[in-house]
């Protein structure tokens, strides 16, 4: 596959069709993820009330479930939205923020994965390792250690849950247990801003809304997301100016930039 050309094609499809991405996401990143959704060309909605979950999810093209700021009412909404998404064939993208940091988070993730059919799990190495049963350590929401390298961990959880797993880091790893893809795009300044991992989950959801092969959607999304960061970095003097430049780069990202700058390789 020509990953760069296909990524450009998917981005064009998003911009033309403007799919609705429903987020049940955390309070820290809500505004940022809404903006990233818009800059990619999709439409965001952040609805959390249990009373409207079925209706709102039914009109969406993808659902993000992000556990960053959990409460029992939000968990109820997650299950209701997730079951509606499964019934309607709408892809679910799960961001297990801080899984492993507390038993509440870890148990909630396991319940979600047991009761819902998730299309893509997007997390850091520690979170994914813990969910795969390989051990690891998460401090707050940051990965400290894991029970293996990213490729092995992604494959393990993908096989366990029968879904696609994306581990973001210096090099992004995407695997469905059979196919494994590496994305080398990105910039270290993404780590200076809170919520950039959560926003990458939003990118995966936007791409999943129009590309129904999860590995392809996730790899192309993370390629475009990382490439925008690379384009933005030379224009920035620090984290604040980088954020503005990054948003502009996402909004203005075009096929020529993607075809020249995307770095994706399939390793199995």
Curated annotation (Swiss-Prot):
**Quick one: which residues bind substrate?**
46, 195
Q: What class of enzyme is it?
A: transferase
Concerning InterPro entries, the annotation shows: Hyethyz_kinase, Ribokinase-like
**Signal peptide extent:** none
User: Which biological process terms from the Gene Ontology are attached to this UniProt entry?
Assistant: thiamine biosynthetic process; thiamine diphosphate biosynthetic process
- Which residues does the record give as ATP binding sites? 122, 168
As cofactor, the record names: Mg(2+)
Q: Which reaction does it catalyse?
A: 5-(2-hydroxyethyl)-4-methylthiazole + ATP = 4-methyl-5-(2-phosphooxyethyl)-thiazole + ADP + H(+)
Q: Identify the Pfam families for this entry.
A: HK
Task: Name any one GO molecular function.
Answer: magnesium ion binding
What are the entry keywords? ATP-binding, Kinase, Magnesium, Metal-binding, Nucleotide-binding, Thiamine biosynthesis, Transferase
| EC numbers | 2.7.1.50
Q: In which pathway does it act?
A: Cofactor biosynthesis; thiamine diphosphate biosynthesis; 4-methyl-5-(2-phosphoethyl)-thiazole from 5-(2-hydroxyethyl)-4-methylthiazole: step 1/1
* Family named by the database record: Belongs to the Thz kinase family.
Described function: Catalyzes the phosphorylation of the hydroxyl group of 4-methyl-5-beta-hydroxyethylthiazole (THZ).
Q: What is this protein called?
A: Hydroxyethylthiazole kinase
| Origin species | Desulfatibacillum aliphaticivorans
In the UniProt record, the gene name given for this protein reads thiM
């Amino acid at each position: 596959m020509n990953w760069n050309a296909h990524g450009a094609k998917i981005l064009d499809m998003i911009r033309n069709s403007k799919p609705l991405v429903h987020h049940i996401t955390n309070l820290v990143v809500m505004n940022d993820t809404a903006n990233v959704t818009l800059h990619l060309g999709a439409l965001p909605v952040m609805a959390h009330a249990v009373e409207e979950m079925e209706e709102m999810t039914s009109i969406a093209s993808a659902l993000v479930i992000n556990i960053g700021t959990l409460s029992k009412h939000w968990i109820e909404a997650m299950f209701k939205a997730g079951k509606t998404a499964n019934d309607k064939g709408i892809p679910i993208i799960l961001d297990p923020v801080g899984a492993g940091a507390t038993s509440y988070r870890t148990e909630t993730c396991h319940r979600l994965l047991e009761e819902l059919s998730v299309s893509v799990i997007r997390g850091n190495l520690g979170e994914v390792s813990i969910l795969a049963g390989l051990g690891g350590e998460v401090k707050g929401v940051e990965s400290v250690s894991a029970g293996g390298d990213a490729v092995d961990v992604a494959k393990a959880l993908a096989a366990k849950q029968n879904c696609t797993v994306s581990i973001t880091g210096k090099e992004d790893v995407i695997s469905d247990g059979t196919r494994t893809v590496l994305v080398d795009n990105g910039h270290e300044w993404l780590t200076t801003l809170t919520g950039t991992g959560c926003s990458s989950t939003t990118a995966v959801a936007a791409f999943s809304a129009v590309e129904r092969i999860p590995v392809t959607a996730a790899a192309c999304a993370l390629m475009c997301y990382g490439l925008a960061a690379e384009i933005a970095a030379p224009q920035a003097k620090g984290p604040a100016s980088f954020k503005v430049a990054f948003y502009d780069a996402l909004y203005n990202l075009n096929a020529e930039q993607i075809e020249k700058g995307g770095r994706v390789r399939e390793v199995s």
